[in-house]
Amino acid sequence: MRIGPVWAGAAGRGRARREALAAGDMALAARLLGRPYSISGHVVHGRKLGRSLGASAEGRGDGFRTLNLRFPHHHPAATGVFVVQVHGLGGPPLPGVASLGVRPTIEDAGRVLLEVHCLEWPERLGAEGAYAKLVRVELLHKLRDEARYDGLAALTEAIARDVGDAHRWFGAHAAERRQTTRDRI
């Protein structure tokens, strides 16, 4: 996406930010905002389906546990699957992968949800320890658009690919993330 170097006032800058987010250009959105685009909210209970899908790492049977945040708008500025960083769980920010959208494989209600799978689940939280915590999720890089899969097996394979892609992204951007990380909500 190409946006000119000059924006006409606040309205032009706002439009440029919305266009960058809609296009999935999270680096441009971060430059325009002066920080990574983020969503804050309290972690809520979900259907607990993620923990029954696959394994977060080879040899583990923990599935893809997620932190679920309700999204108040029916049309978020950005949708899809993203590399993210989670703040607010104590300790350093946690790397993750997140889906922001309507979960087309799981339900057709049209309800927007942010589901975050932390690549390194903090053991101190246990399986249930994040509920009701206020977290901030920074959307760092868009991996792909949201998609409808033919079943849970296909969805699990896609999530596993997303997790691998997120690990690779963090590996390639490790030094950059260390320099810009601030753990505050």
Task: Say what each PLM segment does.
Residues 1-34:
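Contiguous mid-protein beta-loop-alpha structural module that forms a pocket-lining wall or clamp
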Residues 1-5, 40, 46:
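Conserved beta-strand termini and adjacent loop/short-helix elements that scaffold enzyme active sites
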Residues 30, 40, 93-95:
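Acidic/polar loop patches that form or flank catalytic/metal-binding clefts of enzymes
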Residues 46-185:
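Phosphate/ribose-recognition catalytic cores of enzymes acting on nucleotide-derived substrates
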